[in-house]
Amino acid sequence: MTTSLYWQTEGEGSDLVLIHGWGMNGAVWQTTSEKLSQHYRVHTVDLSGYGHSAELGSADFDEMVKQVLAQAPKKAAWLGWSLGGLIATKAALTSPERVSQLITVASSPCFSAEKGWRGIKPLILSQFTEQLKTDFTLTVERFMALQAMGSPNAKQDIKLIKKAVFSRPMPDQQALATGLMILADIDLREAVSQLSMPVCRMYGRLDGLVPIKVAHYMDELMPNSAKIVFEQASHAPFISHNDEFISELRTFLNQHA
């Protein structure tokens, strides 16, 4: 059994790691990585049980982070989308010497909604978990639709996300279940103030999974971080507003090179 994750590396320059979200795989970054590789050495990973990476045992959150760190460049900027943002944030907390800059996209230190904190309602997360047991392909497709919901170009966004995800093997059912548990249970809100490297938080104003209110909460938790809001984007701004996304990302990375 393989004990390593599938990575793609392209381009030359300073190292940049891209981490996908729940139910997805590294192919969602294809357009983004092609453009970024003109300026950076871009490393795209398939998390355990996703895409071309075999399920490396029933990994919990900390183990998933260790798996990515084990094969990531010695030092790099880390960019994580959605669930990938949680993984990148945890890597930056546990191994700050490895993460030169941290960028989270449509992500939150706590995805689950609770009193005084916006997020995904626990009931929705538990419904996804139940649906996984009966039809996990349909569950992933439903999640794709939720990601684009609110975007003016929702149909086109879903089409692009589906094309990318279905270009690689479907995710492992156990990996999907573990990912949902992470989204439901992990809470890094008290830890993020410890981050010492430059941090940029990117949001879609129309995001239904990470409500824009989270961006305002995070202003208080991380007053020294940068915040970028894509006004017409939903949960996948790098899909719906790719050129604008890359421009903002490059500006941040160049400012903190």
Curated annotation (Swiss-Prot):
One of its GO terms (molecular function) is pimelyl-[acyl-carrier protein] methyl ester esterase activity. Residues 16-240 form the AB hydrolase-1 domain. This is Pimeloyl-[acyl-carrier protein] methyl ester esterase. Keywords: Biotin biosynthesis, Cytoplasm, Hydrolase, Serine esterase. The keyword Cytoplasm applies. It comes from the Bacteria. The keyword Ion transport does not apply. Pathway: Cofactor biosynthesis; biotin biosynthesis. It comes from Aliivibrio fischeri (strain MJ11). It catalyses: 6-carboxyhexanoyl-[ACP] methyl ester + H2O = 6-carboxyhexanoyl-[ACP] + methanol + H(+). Transmembrane segments: none annotated. The physiological role of BioH is to remove the methyl group introduced by BioC when the pimeloyl moiety is complete. It allows to synthesize pimeloyl-ACP via the fatty acid synthetic pathway through the hydrolysis of the ester bonds of pimeloyl-ACP esters.
